[in-house]
Curated annotation (Swiss-Prot):
The BetaTrCP degron motif promotes binding to BTRC when phosphorylated. This is Cyclic AMP-dependent transcription factor ATF-4. It comes from Bos taurus. Keywords: Acetylation, Activator, Biological rhythms, Cell membrane, Cytoplasm, Cytoskeleton, DNA-binding, Hydroxylation, Isopeptide bond, Membrane, Nucleus, Phosphoprotein, Repressor, Transcription, Transcription regulation, Ubl conjugation. GO terms for molecular function: cAMP response element binding protein binding; DNA binding; DNA-binding transcription activator activity, RNA polymerase II-specific; DNA-binding transcription factor activity; protein heterodimerization activity; RNA polymerase II cis-regulatory region sequence-specific DNA binding; RNA polymerase II transcription regulatory region sequence-specific DNA binding.
Length: 348
């Protein structure tokens, strides 16, 4: 039981400590990159100083805070201003960094090497400040909604190294030259179609990485194709992207065009003819209805006139019938009186 509890405590301790160990290893690796590549420590060592003092001095005046700063959030070029500046070593207080004995023995060659390290990257900055080769952007200005390049991921930290032709020739291969995509506007005749088709997929591929939308910076096709790391990615992405021509992209997004004027005129004429037919039919129906009403009224008036005449005739005939009935009754009475009179005469 004691052994099981001891093993479980070790496992739990390892679980709790492991994430902090990983963070510590990442921090040590990031600091180790700076300390290993700084060649200033070697100059200190040649002139009789210890490695600890050289590292202390280099870490004091080359602090990690101003190398790894938040300039990437503001602008892509704001972090490279320190490469152009010349550092005046008189402003630094070397009494704090080194003892007086060390300062007295410090030769002038050390100061010269420090000045050289400050001016090391000046030719590289001049090359980046030159106008990049102008290439036609086949899709025009990219929309702001698309993500641009992550400013922290593709850049490599410039490290002060001793000026040598080997290092100066090798650094442009690993560093990227930048260009503003929104400012590249030249006529189509000046650029070759091959360069545009191969450069366009790389620009789109680099923009897939999430970053700030304010900078609007994409990688230049010449620099991306020149580096050995990005050449296979461009060769893979170019066939798929080159198939999409600018006309196809614009045609898919645009709505269908309006009908030509000839079809409009024909449609208007057909509609006008239909309306005219309907209006004519309506007028004919109205006239037929009015005529029918007029006929009915005339017929009714005629019938009413005849009815009145017949009623008058009927009344006249009734009067005649009454008069005739009275005459018949009078005649019957007369006949009865005559018959009675004859019977009396016979009796007598």
């Amino acid at each position: 039981m004691a052994e099981m509890s001891f093993l479980s405590s070790e496992v739990l301790g390892g679980d709790f400590v492991s994430p902090f160990d990983q963070l510590g290893l990442g921090a040590e690796e990031s600091l180790g990159l700076l300390d290993d590549n700084l060649e200033v420590a070697k100059h200190f060592k040649h002139h009789g100083f210890s490695c600890d003092k050289a590292k202390a001095g280099s870490s004091e005046w080359l602090a990690v805070d101003w190398l790894v700063s938040d300039n990437s959030k503001e602008d892509a070029f704001s972090g490279t201003d320190w490469m152009v500046e010349k550092m005046d070593l008189k402003e630094f207080d070397f009494d704090i960094l080194f003892s007086k004995d060390d300062l007295e023995t410090m030769p002038d060659e050390l100061l010269a090497t420090l000045d050289d390290t400050c001016d090391l990257f000046q030719p590289l900055v001049q090359e980046t400040n030159k106008e990049p080769p102008q290439i036609v952007n086949p899709i025009g200005h990219l929309p702001e909604g698309l993500p641009t390049i992550d400013q922290g991921a593709p850049f490599t930290f410039f490290q002060p190294l001793p000026p040598s032709p080997g290092t100066l020739s090798s650094t442009p291969d690993h560093s990227f030259s930048l260009e503003l995509c929104s400012e590249v506007v030249i006529p189509e005749g000046d650029s070759k179609p091959d360069s545009t088709t191969t450069g366009f997929p790389q620009c789109i591929k680099e923009e897939d990485a999430p970053s700030d939308n304010d900078s609007g910076i994409c990688m230049s096709p010449d620099s991306s194709l020149g580096s050995p790391q990005d050449s296979p990615s461009t060769s893979r992405g170019s066939p798929n992207k080159s198939l999409l021509s600018p006309g196809a992209l614009s045609g898919s997004s645009r709505p269908k065009p309006y009908d030509p004027p000839g079809e409009k005129m024909v449609a208007a004429k057909v509609k006008g003819e239909k309306l005219d037919k309907k209006l004519k039919k309506m007028e004919q129906n109205k006239t037929a209805a009015t005529r029918y009403r007029q006929k009915k009224r005339a017929e009714q008036e005629a019938l009413t006139g005849e009815c009145k005449e017949l009623e008058k005739k009927n009344e006249a005939l009734k009067e005649k019938a009454d008069s005739l009935a009275k005459e018949i009754q009078y005649l019957k009475d007369q006949i009865e009186e005559v018959r009675k009179a004859r019977e009396k005469k016979r009796v007598l």
